[in-house]
């Protein structure tokens, strides 16, 4: 199965989370995982993927302009139904606790529903998500005054999302 992680990152925080998600997905030996910054991401690759995970820093509860511009170029895939039944998931980082993580993830999920994708999040019984995460995807607060780019909890949450997407995608593609 092929999984594509696409991210926008301005201060490297979201890049670290994207890499953790890719690591988690790669724990499944059947997964071939690709990861690209949005500036290098090729929308033509999407129709060959089984799962697509995209994310960005949250900007006042909405998608970063770089990822939004990229998503807005997916209209022809929508018109041709190329992403229908592909697994989708999202992730986000913000600088503050109330920086709009969940609203940003809602905004990231919406285009996936328009494309007919099967969106997966992180259920509450996933240990990494129980006290730290969000049901909508991997959302991590990365305070600007911290010396570390990403907390260990954030990295574990990213890996958990990657594992979940890989597991669900494997289950859905096993019968094909």
Swiss-Prot record:
**PROSITE patterns assigned to the protein according to its UniProt record, in alphabetical order:** FLAVODOXIN_LIKE (PS50902)
Return any one Pfam family short name. Answer: FMN_red
Instruction: Give residue ranges for domain Flavodoxin-like.
Output: 3-162
| UniProt GO molecular function | FMN binding; NAD(P)H dehydrogenase (quinone) activity
Q: Which InterPro entries match?
A: Flavodoxin/NO_synth (IPR008254), Flavoprotein-like_sf (IPR029039), FMN_Rdtase-like_dom (IPR005025)
Q: Name one GO cellular component term.
A: membrane
Superkingdom per UniProt = Bacteria
Name of this protein: Uncharacterized protein YhcB
Query: Which organism's genome codes for this protein?
Result: Bacillus subtilis (strain 168)
**Name of the gene encoding the protein in the UniProt record:** yhcB
């Amino acid at each position: 199965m092929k999984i594509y992680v696409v991210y926008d990152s301005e201060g490297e925080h979201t890049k670290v989370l994207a890499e953790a998600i890719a690591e988690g997905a790669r724990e499944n030996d059947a997964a071939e995982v690709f990861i690209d910054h949005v500036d290098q991401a090729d929308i033509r690759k999407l129709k060959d993927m089984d799962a697509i995970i995209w994310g960005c820093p949250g900007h006042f509860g909405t998608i970063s302009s770089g990822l939004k511009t990229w998503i807005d170029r997916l209209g022809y895939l929508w018109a041709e139904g190329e992403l229908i039944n592909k697994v989708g998931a999202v992730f986000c980082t913000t600088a503050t606790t109330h920086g709009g993580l969940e609203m940003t993830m809602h905004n990231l999920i919406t285009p996936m529903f328009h494309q007919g994708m099967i969106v997966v999040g992180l259920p509450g019984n996933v240990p990494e998500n129980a006290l730290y995460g969000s049901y909508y995807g991997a959302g991590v607060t990365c305070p600007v005054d911290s010396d570390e780019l990403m907390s260990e909890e954030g990295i574990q949450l990213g890996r958990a999302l990657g594992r979940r997407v890989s597991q669900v995608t494997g289950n859905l593609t096993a019968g094909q």
